[in-house]
Each structure stands twice: as structure tokens, then as C-alpha cells.
Amino acid sequence: MSEYQSIGVIGAGAWGTALAQTAAKAGRDVTLWSFENDVAEAVNTKHENTIYLPDVALSTAIVATTSISDLDACDAILAVAPAQHLRRVLEGFLPYARPGLPIVLCAKGIEQSSLSMMTQVLKETIPAALPAVLSGPSFAIDTAQGLPTAVTLACADETVGNALIEALGTSRFRPYLATDLIGAEIGGAVKNVLAIGCGISEGKGLGKSAHAALISRGFAEMTRLALALGAQRETLAGLCGLGDLVLTCSSPQSRNMSCGLALGRGVSLDDIMSGRRAVTEGVASAPAVVELARRHGVEMPICEAVNEILAGRASVDDAIETLLARPFTLETA
């Protein structure tokens, strides 16, 4: 039996449900907390998340609840609430979190109000928890259906990290251990903003060459910010950096890229967001990424252009022209 036999999942969106399914397939007992009654009821009665992950038959080992106190006896927690709501959700879980409880942060974003990474939010809300980060190239539907997926699980305590990998890993879901939490977090947050940019390029019909340039130059921006914050370069070259960036920037299955596609085709951001129930993390993270970069003296022109478009301060065409008018420079700059 695993050291972490009972897994609590906080957040029953598509990704939280997919991770619950993966943990159940790994033989764990899973309690899935949902903010929404209709989601919890569907998971328990139909064994399907009809709202966020329809047409996927869920394991009967997953028990959904709307009472976060039901996670008090879990051996480890996967925190999959959206980045901008994580603080409030963790504050609600604080009374039930015992010291040393591993909490794996699965949201990819930066808190807009404080510019805090998710590990910092956890440190401020549940300081006695043991933090880990799960990030990498993984669409919820692929993971839930058991298609081969590899991710990074970052944990400073390698013993705990390896135990979490044993608890969650299967032949189809393969976590790789890292100890660089900052790198894993920055990769996940910045790639969402860059994916919006790639979607805009695709929506405007700028071609595959421009798409490749955005991915590679975007990766340089991601790496510069991560290094400025103390991350290791090797982390960004792995699954949680380059791997996640390539996936998210290459498929309209990504909510961030599909948002950019619509923007590039002339749809307003308000119209895009009003038609979505699921969160598009890059929209909320863009201003935080840009401000964090400014405070650390890091140039991120692609992310800045995306943020200007999202904020309504620049049209898509003007933002593109501004990028193309930048001075020529060394590729490593």
C-alpha cells in the first residue's frame, strides 16, 4: 500500500477531475472537493463530471463532496483550484490541514493581486504544509482517458517527492521528480500567456514560421524571468517549461490558445470570456507576469504585447507591428 493511500483533490474542474481519475487508476482512494453542488452530484451518481469533463467514465473510487472538511483525513492533497481563487480555498482548508501534510499545487498561474506564486500563497495560508508542484504538458481529457502523459513533480524533499510519484504514477501517467519549485511554477504560468500570443498569431493567419518564432522567443522570455527569480535553467528545458509551452501553443484544445485564436479573428475578450465556464488562466496571469518581469528588470516583449491586447490598450494589429518594429539584437539577448 502507498504511503499516500488517500488523496484529496481540491477543485473539480477538468484538470482536478482528470487528476482524481489518475490517482484512482493508481489504486488510491480519492476524495474530490467541488465548489459546485451539481458537479459533485454528477460525479457521485453518474460517475461523470458532466460540466467540465463530459463523456469520461470516472472511477467509482472517486467520492465527490462539497464539504472541504471531508478531506481532513487524506494523506496528501492535490490543490487544483484556479490560481486567482487558491488563497481563499486554502484558507477554508486550513483548519483541517495537519502539520507536514503534502499539498501538491497544480494550478498554473500567478496571483494577480500580490504577484505571488502558488507556493508563496500556500506558505502564507498553510505554513506548516509541505509544498510540491505538479506541472507539465498535459491536457485534462488525455490524462483522464489514460493516454500517455509525462509531467514534472517538483518537491524540495526528494523522499516525499518520490513517495508522491509512487502514489500518483501509472504506466500512462509518468511524473518525473525535480527539486526546483520556482522553475516549475514559472514555466506553467508564463506558457499560458505565450499560448494566447500564439493563438492570436494563428487567428491572424501569420503562418507557421511566425508561430515557431513566438514559441522559441517566448521560451527565452520564460527562461529569463525564471532565472531572475532563482530557478535552474535545466528545469525550463524540461516538461514543465519547454514541454508545456510546446503543447499549449500548438493546439486549440488549450483554453489559452483558443482564446488567442478568437482574439486574432476579431472577437472581443468580453465575448470570449462570457461564453466560458472554465477558467482561462493566462488572461488573469498576464498582468502579473508583466509586472513581475518589470520589477526584476526582465524584458518580455511578447508577454507585454499580449497583456496590452488583453487590457484593451492596444489592438491586435498595433501590438503585432510594435513587436515587429523592435530593434535587431543578439538571439541570446
UniProtKB/Swiss-Prot annotation:
Binding site for NADPH: 15, 108, 140, 255, 279, 281
Class of this enzyme: oxidoreductase
EC number of this enzyme: 1.1.1.94
Keyword Oxidoreductase: yes
Residues given in the record as sn-glycerol 3-phosphate binding sites: 108, 136, 138, 191, 244, 254-256
GO cellular-component term (any): cytosol
Family: Belongs to the NAD-dependent glycerol-3-phosphate dehydrogenase family.
Protein name: Glycerol-3-phosphate dehydrogenase [NAD(P)+]
Source species: Maricaulis maris (strain MCS10) (Caulobacter maris)
